[in-house]
Amino acid sequence: MAKKAMIEREKKRERLVAKYAAKRAELKEIANDESRPMEERFKARLKLAKLPRNSSATRLHNRCQLTGRPHAYYRKLKVSRIALRELGSNGQIPGMVKSSW
């Protein structure tokens, strides 16, 4: 299981991304608009750079909701392969049965 600090850090990043998403999108639109004056675009880039680093969606990493594991993550269920196997074996995922052949 991942350290609690890593899990909390990731949750904090998710909150920051949600908080600054609209402002970030607005500034990016201004900065990438070729029809606007160069000075206005440059100011938008500076404002964008002053936003918190963790407010960028690029810094997010998918982690298992149960264990915090960063690898082998199923996006639909938001759990890792190991947690998925455990939940499936316990019958906690509807429609999922253990396969044998």
UniProtKB/Swiss-Prot annotation:
It comes from the Bacteria. The keyword Transferase does not apply. One of its GO terms (biological process) is translation. SUPFAM superfamilies: Glucocorticoid receptor-like (DNA-binding domain). Gene3D superfamilies: 1.10.287.1480. One of its GO terms (cellular component) is small ribosomal subunit. GO terms for molecular function: rRNA binding; structural constituent of ribosome. The keyword rRNA-binding applies. Keywords: Ribonucleoprotein, Ribosomal protein, RNA-binding, rRNA-binding. PANTHER family: 30S RIBOSOMAL PROTEIN S14, SMALL RIBOSOMAL SUBUNIT PROTEIN US14M. Binds 16S rRNA, required for the assembly of 30S particles and may also be responsible for determining the conformation of the 16S rRNA at the A site. NCBIfam families: PRK08881.1. Belongs to the universal ribosomal protein uS14 family. Part of the 30S ribosomal subunit. Contacts proteins S3 and S10. This is Small ribosomal subunit protein uS14.
